């Protein structure tokens, strides 16, 4: 009887850990798409997971999933800031970590929480995921430009460097290519939701 209870407790613990660790993991692997790793599909997987969890999953923990995914994305993607502040800003290690955490939390609050607001305002009035999700994400990206004076890190459009699509930079810019990626991952979610277990066209 004791062994059965311990197994149940261990199973519940693992399930709880997965609920918190999974969004962080999928957020952090998106960073692998950028230099020096340049594993392009990592960001596709990362954003496909995020959009599915927020707009198609029956999981009601939207705020939790969004916060943890965003923390994984920003904490890993901008962690180099700690080193820069510590070595070149004459700030203590504790101060560097504190400033990094403030930046990460600021990015999450001001550029990812609006996704939930826009979801309630727009998506609840229309089920056209393919049309509205890319619109929401590109709107958030423009907000990043405006509020942080062109904050250049972790923009999805940059992953098209060294691909056949880089010729489009001169035509539609980084934001245009970000929009292309958002449309692609939204297509993935639509196909998966319709039980079509074949990801959308090969973009790279």
Provide a role label for each language-model segment.
Residues 1-4:
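Short, Lys/Arg-enriched N-terminal segments with co-localized hydrophobic residues
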Residues 6-204:
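Membrane-embedded alpha-helical bundles of multi-pass enzymes
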């Amino acid at each position: 009887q004791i062994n059965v209870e311990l197994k149940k407790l261990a199973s519940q613990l693992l399930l709880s850990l997965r609920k918190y660790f999974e969004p962080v993991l999928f957020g952090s692997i998106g960073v692998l798409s950028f230099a020096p790793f340049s594993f392009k599909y990592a960001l596709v997987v990362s954003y496909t997971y995020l959009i599915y969890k927020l707009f198609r999953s029956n999981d009601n923990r939207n705020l939790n999933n969004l916060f943890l995914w965003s923390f994984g994305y920003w904490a890993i993607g901008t962690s180099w800031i700690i080193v820069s502040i510590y070595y070149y800003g004459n700030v203590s290690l504790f101060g560097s970590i504190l400033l990094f955490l403030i930046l990460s939390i600021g990015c999450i609050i001001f550029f990812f929480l609006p996704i939930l607001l826009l979801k309630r305002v727009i998506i609840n009035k229309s089920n056209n995921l393919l049309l509205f999700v890319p619109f929401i994400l590109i709107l958030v990206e423009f907000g990043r430009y405006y509020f942080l004076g062109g904050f250049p890190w972790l923009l999805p459009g940059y992953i098209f460097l060294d691909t056949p699509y880089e010729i489009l930079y001169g035509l539609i810019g980084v934001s245009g290519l970000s929009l292309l990626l958002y449309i692609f991952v939204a297509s993935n979610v639509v196909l998966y939701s319709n039980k079509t277990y074949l990801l959308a066209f090969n973009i790279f």
